[in-house]
Swiss-Prot record:
Pathway annotation from the record: Nitrogen metabolism; nitric oxide reduction
A single BP term in Gene Ontology: phosphorelay signal transduction system
Functional description taken from the UniProt entry: Required for the expression of anaerobic nitric oxide (NO) reductase, acts as a transcriptional activator for at least the norVW operon. Activation also requires sigma-54.
GO terms, molecular function: ATP binding; ATP hydrolysis activity; DNA binding; DNA-binding transcription factor activity
Positions that bind ATP: 215-222, 278-287
Source organism of this protein record: Shigella flexneri
Name assigned to this protein: Anaerobic nitric oxide reductase transcription regulator NorR
PROSITE patterns: SIGMA54_INTERACT_1, SIGMA54_INTERACT_2, SIGMA54_INTERACT_3, SIGMA54_INTERACT_4
Modified residues (4-aspartylphosphate): D57
Keyword Phosphoprotein: yes
Amino acid sequence: MSFSVDVLANIAIELQRGIGHQDRFQRLITTLRQVLECDASALLRYDSRQFIPLAIDGLAKDVLGRRFALEGHPRLEAIARAGDVVRFPADSELPDPYDGLIPGQESLKVHACVGLPLFVGQNLIGALTLDGMQPDQFDVFSDEELRLIAALAAGALSNALLIEQLESQNMLPGDATPFEAVKQTQMIGLSPGMTQLKKEIEIVAASDLNVLISGETGTGKELVAKAIHEASPRAVNPLVYLNCAALPESVAESELFGHVKGAFTGAISNRSGKFEMADNGTLFLDEIGELSLALQAKLLRVLQYGDIQRVGDDRSLRVDVRVLAATNRDLREEVLAGRFRADLFHRLSVFPLSVPPLRERGDDVILLAGYFCEQCRLRQGLSRVVLSAGARNLLQHYSFPGNVRELEHAIHRAVVLARATRNGDEVILEAQHFAFPEVTLPPPEAAAVPVVKQNLREATEAFQRETIRQALAQNHHNWAACARMLETDVANLHRLAKRLGLKD
């Protein structure tokens, strides 16, 4: 069945009801999935020859963490190259990027696929993808109808990108709450902790303040530093990295400030230090808590006065460097213990950032797992790498003391193990491919068998009644929102509620 102007109007209304970009995007694709009766839909942003999922419906959650490079996904490349609706036949030789990523149908391949490139003028900004398990699922919809859908989606995405651009240039009126970022590609995560961290990165990036980034080993502190630099006015200049923990005391001063020829044995020529290399840019000092007190004093002088002295040189050099420092230690405790200078701590922690451990990030672990699965797929030349339901359950219940780095290594190892036990270039990661110690999984919910006191019809109606009551409570008795949650038509929901005695 085709859709009417009323359907398009309802889609537009849903977009206006959304609070923030993410909510609008989710409402858009959820509504589209219902209207077009497809098995899965996704809104993707285009950036640097890759598609980045912004919102999905009907797909495994880890899709949100994947980055679909065009070189590895010929269907998406065909969509990017097209200027119009793209329909892929059921017998298309081009693999579908979502094969194995529709929950409950991991072993089946997508049969119907439509791609809608999204443009602003002549510029590609994203795509809508619609997938179904039936070969002729989208034949009833004309290209013209699908173009109208694409126009609505392109408008929503274009507005979000424009708002983000204006906000970054401080051109939005008033003191509105910052919009959530659309262009963040590296900082994967939708948990409250990561959402707050992204907002703080946007705020501090625009300034020239020194930043102290704290967090456990493997949480991604270097990625935070990179995000700050790339969003700052210094982004056109270098970001220089130095791991303080790997610096032998004998060469640490030379690494930081450079040396002149003959300053010490082996100094056969003049050499610039990291501060000179980072002039007009950013210097990232990782594991700064490992620096000796003597070097801390010299670093403090640079932060105070902006000049350095090469080892063996009496002359001072002016440098303009923003310092981002990271540590997995509690520097306040280090100050109290006399192992870190209090004055340096206060100089560095003008704007402190804390990176949450993976165990506190909820479903972010699944998004990150999807990202690493896609990386493995590309590096090893596989057609697909997907997580089984059991593997996802295991990842969600493991504490990951090594944080994101441990997850990355675990995914890479699991892919190698799974590939060794399976022929072909399709890999499904099962729970047994992960070697996590002492993971206690919750027992199955259906452990107890209830005593039957109703016939099947009464039991079904009781279940429907309670489900609708709970959905209404969660949506503040908004019937339209309740229908979206239950994935049903609002008119059908009203009729069912009347039959069940929930409405007059």
